[in-house]
């Protein structure tokens, strides 16, 4: 099968797109050895700064550098404005869905989404039922994963509402590009992103009804794959980075242990999953959480960002209903479309999936990080048949989608520059207002032909420029 990919830098006639012309001129005039030297400098600087991630399942548990590519992904400002509006619209609808789900459940009563699809979902938290949240916001920090098909149309691949990660790489990639190639930023107007930590802190503070709430970042600890990001964001916001053992609950209030005695905590930006937050309420074996945290939360004495139970809205089995959520709650047409999705829990759609596995991408509804998925066109017959057996055994645990022709962007590889597939994760902050920092994290599949961009699967990152037209 011949696939047509949308190239971010070159049009169908091989001409450089207008928003890339300045970069293309610079690239043509810059000696190859200088580019190679700067790339080596970037690797060294990232290593010194500790910009790493830990690969789960790695026997050595080693920290790895996320490969950084110095050819940016560039988006014209006019195009970005549409993407931005689409992301804001989508996250607003998802927050309205969560408010409705944990209160009146109008969308279920209207027959738009089946009750069992959400109420039997393992991410649904009965403890949240009837609990009112300040501003009715459940997902304060959201990541919306976008891809472009062969004709350049943006699609939402998935929503990330639990503990979306990657924003630290977005910020560090920009700092690295400005340090190594300042002349590029002097030659054109590229939207800044360095104000993200200030926006994040403002969002977290606005999540509390208090005038000047105390904010902390709760991390599972240094062995977590995203620990660098937890420490980075706490430092950039000027707030404390804490582990569960640093906090305790007394009289349904959360306190932080300090050398000066207990200090009240009002907002927790938590970077661990629901199951580990409170051993008294969730997983009793958790050593990462804070005993009594749920009780304090239900009393309204502490804010958790993101809220407990947000995961039900970004579950892949709920994803097919998001465009209907937009119509139901906002009375608007979706600006960004979903990828067509087959739900294996439905017998007719299951039959279609099983008959077309070599052409489809199949995902576990609870999967993440590029794990638990089948990319049909890139799989062997044995891999496809093994996955077929898994789907038949538990069809409700899988969805399937057509294999998209993900857009490509020129990327440095071992033997020069070649196109590699990319996606985009803009970060949406929901507080007094809903805001998106221009661009986001561009992830790139460095292996030739690969469509999997996750760092856990060998993917890298690029700086993302929003360039004035």
Cite the ranges covered by each PLM segment:
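Preference for protein termini
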Residues: 1-469
């Amino acid at each position: 099968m011949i696939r047509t990919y949308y190239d971010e830098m070159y049009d169908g006639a091989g001409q450089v797109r207008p928003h890339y012309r300045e970069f293309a001129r610079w690239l043509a005039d810059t000696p190859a050895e200088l580019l190679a030297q700067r790339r080596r400098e970037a690797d060294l600087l990232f290593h010194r700064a500790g910009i790493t991630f830990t690969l789960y399942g790695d026997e050595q548990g080693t920290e790895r550098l996320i490969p950084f590519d110095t050819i940016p992904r560039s988006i014209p400002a006019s195009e970005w404005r549409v993407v931005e509006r689409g992301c804001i619209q989508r996250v607003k609808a998802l927050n309205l869905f969560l408010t409705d789900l944990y209160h009146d459940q109008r969308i279920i009563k209207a027959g738009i989404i089946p009750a069992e699809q959400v109420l039997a979902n393992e991410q649904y938290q009965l403890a949240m039922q009837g609990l009112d949240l300040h501003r009715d916001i459940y997902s304060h920090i959201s990541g919306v994963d976008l891809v472009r098909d062969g004709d350049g149309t943006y699609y939402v691949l998935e929503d990330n509402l639990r503990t979306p990660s990657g924003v630290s790489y977005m910020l560090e990639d920009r700092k690295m590009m400005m340090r190594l190639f300042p002349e590029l930023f002097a030659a054109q107007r590229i939207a800044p992103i360095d104000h993200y930590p200030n926006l994040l802190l403002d969002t977290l503070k606005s999540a509390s009804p208090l005038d000047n709430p105390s904010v902390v970042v709760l991390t599972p600890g240094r062995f977590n794959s995203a620990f660098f990001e937890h420490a980075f964001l706490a430092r950039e916001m000027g707030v404390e980075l804490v582990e569960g053992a640093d906090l305790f609950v007394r009289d349904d209030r959360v306190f932080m242990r300090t050398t000066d005695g207990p200090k009240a905590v009002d907002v927790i930006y938590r970077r661990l999953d629901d199951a580990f937050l409170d051993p008294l309420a969730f997983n009793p074996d958790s050593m990462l959480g804070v005993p009594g945290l749920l009780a304090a939360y239900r009393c309204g004495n502490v804010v958790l960002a993101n809220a407990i139970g947000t995961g039900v809205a970004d579950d892949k089995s709920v994803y097919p209903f998001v465009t209907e959520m937009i119509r139901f709650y906002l009375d608007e047409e979706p600006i960004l479309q979903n990828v067509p999705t087959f739900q294996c829990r439905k017998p007719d759609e299951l039959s279609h999936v099983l008959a077309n596995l070599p052409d489809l991408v199949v995902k576990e509804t609870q999967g993440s990080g590029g794990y638990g998925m089948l990319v049909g066109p890139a799989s062997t017959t044995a891999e496809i048949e093994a996955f077929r057996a898994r789907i038949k055994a538990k069809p409700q645990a899988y969805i399937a989608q057509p294999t998209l022709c993900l857009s490509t962007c020129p990327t440095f590889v071992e033997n020069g520059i070649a196109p590699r597939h990319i996606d985009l994760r803009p970060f949406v902050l929901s507080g007094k207002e809903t805001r998106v920092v221009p661009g986001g994290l561009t992830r790139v599949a460095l292996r030739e032909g690969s469509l999997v961009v996750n760092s856990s699967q060998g993917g890298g990152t690029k700086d993302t420029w929003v360039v004035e037209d």
